[in-house]
């Protein structure tokens, strides 16, 4: 049996990794624990990020990271899935979480990565028969960029929501957290223009 764990990370640039598992609301823990890693479908999973209007999520701005660990042999396998924008209106859940001065970015796993998700799922299924404990870690990383003219001295406050299937609604994965925008060289990450 798999144990689901939420090790949620927000990150900007290569530094500023913030373990945000402390920011996972208690009410979201049962939803995380109920996620069935064997039946996860890349075409179904959606992530939403609420960020200040002064920031954007570029094409490489958000990643879903799934890590499975097995006690037998102390083996770990990790898969990173880059997320792309999802067209359409926000769900009622997301609409209720809109705030003045913030935008909600809906994203999903790139459909071309569906075969990798299928391979990852097959790997997890093969572990079912293996003795010992197994665990699944779900992480979301974000790398927002600063829009031209925005204040580079104010770190963005970001919230992350997860939607495991299209039949379910989103739930809060990470409450609003401040994320440093400064890159290792000391500069802010600016959005590309034109």
Model-derived segments and spans:
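C-terminal motif of bacterial Sec signal peptides marking the signal peptidase cleavage site
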Residues: 17-20
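Post-signal peptide N-terminal segment of mature Sec-exported envelope proteins
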Residues: 29-52
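Beta-strand elements of well-folded, non-transmembrane domains
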Residues: 51-55, 68-72, 142-146
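Glycine-rich, aromatic-bearing surface loops/beta-hairpins
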Residues: 128-194
């Amino acid at each position: 049996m798999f144990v689901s764990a939420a090790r949620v990370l927000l990150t900007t640039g290569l530094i500023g990794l913030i373990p945000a598992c402390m920011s996972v609301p208690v009410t979201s823990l049962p939803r995380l624990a109920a996620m069935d890693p064997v039946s996860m479908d890349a075409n179904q999973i959606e992530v939403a990020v609420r960020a200040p209007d002064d920031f954007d999520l570029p094409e490489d701005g958000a990643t879903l990271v799934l890590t499975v660990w097995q006690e037998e042999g102390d083996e770990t396998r990790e898969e990173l899935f880059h997320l792309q924008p999802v067209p359409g209106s926000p769900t009622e859940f997301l609409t209720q979480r809109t705030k003045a001065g913030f935008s909600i970015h809906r994203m999903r796993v790139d459909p071309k990565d569906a075969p990798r998700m299928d391979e990852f799922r097959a790997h997890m299924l093969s572990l079912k028969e293996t003795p010992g404990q197994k665990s699944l870690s779900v992480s979301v990383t974000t790398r927002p960029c600063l829009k031209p003219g925005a204040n580079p001295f104010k770190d963005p406050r970001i919230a992350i929501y997860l939607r495991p299937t299209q039949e379910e609604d989103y739930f809060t994965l990470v409450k609003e957290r401040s994320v440093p925008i400064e890159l290792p060289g000391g500069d802010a990450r600016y959005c590309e223009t034109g």
